[in-house]
């Protein structure tokens, strides 16, 4: 009974299977840095909120100054 593939073809098929298996196992057993990315995202969000609140405070202080000068 003859094999459907030559030895060279079988070697490439086996090599592809091994590489695919290694990448699959690596993706399962490595821990991603999602926690670091989430922390950075939260920090950026906090900074944006702080800047917005500072702008609001500055605007309200200026309005109070203008009102005081007008009175």
UniProtKB/Swiss-Prot annotation:
It is found in: Membrane. Residues 46-55 have a biased composition (Basic residues). One of its GO terms (cellular component) is membrane. The keyword Membrane applies. The chain crosses the membrane at residues 8-28. Residues 56-71 have a biased composition (Basic and acidic residues). This is Small integral membrane protein 31. The gene is SMIM31.
